[in-house]
From Swiss-Prot:
Record-level Gene Ontology MF annotations: deoxyribose-phosphate aldolase activity
Upper taxonomic lineage: Bacteria, Bacillati, Bacillota, Bacilli, Bacillales
Protein name per its UniProtKB record: Deoxyribose-phosphate aldolase
Cytoplasm listed as a keyword: yes
Biological processes per GO annotation: 2-deoxyribose 1-phosphate catabolic process; carbohydrate catabolic process; deoxyribonucleotide catabolic process
Family: Belongs to the DeoC/FbaB aldolase family. DeoC type 1 subfamily.
Reaction catalysis annotation: 2-deoxy-D-ribose 5-phosphate = D-glyceraldehyde 3-phosphate + acetaldehyde
Name of the coding gene: deoC
Primary location: cytoplasm
CDD domains registered for this protein in UniProt: DeoC
EC number: 4.1.2.4
GO CC annotation, single: cytoplasm
Physiological role: Catalyzes a reversible aldol reaction between acetaldehyde and D-glyceraldehyde 3-phosphate to generate 2-deoxy-D-ribose 5-phosphate.
Origin species: Bacillus anthracis
């Protein structure tokens, strides 16, 4: 298994510097990861540095709480794409989902999907650690209905990350034609392989190099 091509090499911490981002970009070139996943402020730099390389530029929308307005998320998406993003990972309105406001949740996702249409993949972060199994299923169903390309477990900034059980539930819910991304707490090759075996088609990790080299040392971040 070419595990590197399933990994979004991720750096999303608030104190990320340009030097940190450049390191992630160089590692992505070297190990040929699927993408680099960075905050929107770094998209232009990443797009310039990765031009001509088979590495996508992924950024985050409404991150990490998902509580910004739909209009803000749609604008963020358009702006990120204009600066070179080819994938966007958006956070759902978790509170609205828990309130049972399916219409708001679906519209929120739909507007981001429309803003990205034909230009970028949309991955929908449902923040599994805050949801019941019924809510996880509903979030996945609404994501598919709204036209998302992927569903994703976690931001890595909440109370928990990906589990094989959640990945299996999400895969069962979305079927074979929508991607499932495991993120949050995937630190070793064994972790990553477990997620793929459960149904993940992409893995988000900051410990990507350690995963590829099968080196458990140096894999310390939550994401």
């Amino acid at each position: 298994m070419n595990i590197a091509k399933l990994i979004d090499h991720t750096i999303l911490k608030a104190n990320t510097t340009k030097e940190d981002v450049m390191k992630v970009i160089e590692e992505a070139k070297e190990y040929k990861f699927a993408s680099v996943c960075i905050n929107p402020t770094w998209v232009k730099l990443a797009a310039e540095e990765l031009a001509g390389h088979d590495v996508d530029v992924c950024t985050v929308i409404g991150f990490p709480l998902g509580a910004s307005t739909t209009e803000t998320k749609a604008f963020e998406t358009k702006d990120a794409i204009a600066k070179g993003a080819t994938e966007v990972d958006m956070v759902i309105n978790v509170g609205a989902l828990k309130d049972g406001d399916n219409e708001l949740v679906e519209k929120d996702i739909y507007e981001v999907v429309q803003a990205a249409k034909g230009k970028a993949l949309v991955k929908v972060i449902i923040e599994t650690c805050l949801l019941t199994d019924e809510e996880k299923v509903r979030a996945c169903e609404l994501s598919v209905k709204a036209g998302a390309d992927f569903v994703k477990t976690s931001t890595g900034f909440s109370t928990g990350g990906a589990t094989a059980e959640d990945i299996a539930l999400m895969r069962k819910t979305v079927g074979p034609n929508v991607g499932v991304k495991a993120s949050g707490g995937v630190r070793t090759r064994e972790d990553a392989e477990k997620m793929v075996a459960a149904g993940a088609s992409r893995v988000g990790a900051s410990a990507s190099v350690a995963i590829v080299l099968n080196d458990a040392k140096g894999a310390t971040d939550n994401y």
